Amino acid sequence: MTANLAGDVTMRYVDLPPSEPADAVPVLLLHGFGTNFGMNWSAAGWPQALGGAGLRVLGPDLRGHGGSDKPLDEAAYLPERFTADLLGLLDELAVDRVDLVGYSMGSRLAWELALTAPDRVRRAALGGFGPVNAFADADLSAPGAGDTPFDQVFRTVSGLAGNDAEALAACARGQAARPFAADPAPVGVPLLFVSGARDTLATGAEDLAARCGGTHVEIPGRDHANAVSSRVFKQAVVDFLVG
């Protein structure tokens, strides 16, 4: 399915009903940089885990990714443009309130959405996310050309089928133009942070959780690339949303 949002962006998304109807708000899944709903969430079994817990799943491909439009202007990728997209999608679907589950860049956007529109967010689970600047030391005029952790990620994702390297570069510059700030934190939205014990891109997640009154779960033996498929991650989120 697609939604025509404000401006010139068309967003592709899926809307998956739960296995058994339940009285719960939908869950909006927000994927990481250079992936899409299918790669980040479906392939890791998240629709089944959440649907089996009685939760409706909303899964957009964020702008610049997957089957959604891919503008080439970095201003199109400022965090506030993403949050406007997500609020527009909720309005299109007549969904008043959601739970958020993000991973990596998707967690940054979940934080921003909870900060911008706390009345639309019940709870937020943030995976693979910490206060560290993901773009530190990277030359974003030529992403992928260096040896920073971000350059390594960019080289990997820019070569994936369906990705547009120019759009991803613009996305990186747009995100970097608004560095993450832990203060202020979302108010009135319970937060769960989940990170792999070997995740060098989400360092500081435990400290961030403590600073904003959230809860942190560490996944033994997992890094940034494989934490999202962990049963520990899925169970922690289901318990947080349903328990």
Question: How should these model regions be labeled?
Answer:
Residues 12-69:
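Conserved HGGG/HGGXW glycine-rich cap/lid loop of the alpha/beta-hydrolase fold
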Residues 200-206:
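Conserved alpha/beta-hydrolase "acid-adjacent" motif
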Residues 80-98:
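Conserved acidic catalytic loop of the alpha/beta-hydrolase fold
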Residues 108-116, 122-149:
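Flexible "cap/lid" loop of the alpha/beta hydrolase fold
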Residues 166-183, 198-200:
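Active-site nucleophile elbow and catalytic-triad environment of alpha/beta-hydrolase enzymes
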Residues 187, 193-195:
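Short beta-strand/loop motif that positions the catalytic acidic residue
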Residues 222-234:
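Catalytic histidine-centered segment of alpha/beta-hydrolase-like enzymes
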Residues 1-11:
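N-terminal cap/lid segment of alpha/beta-hydrolase-fold proteins
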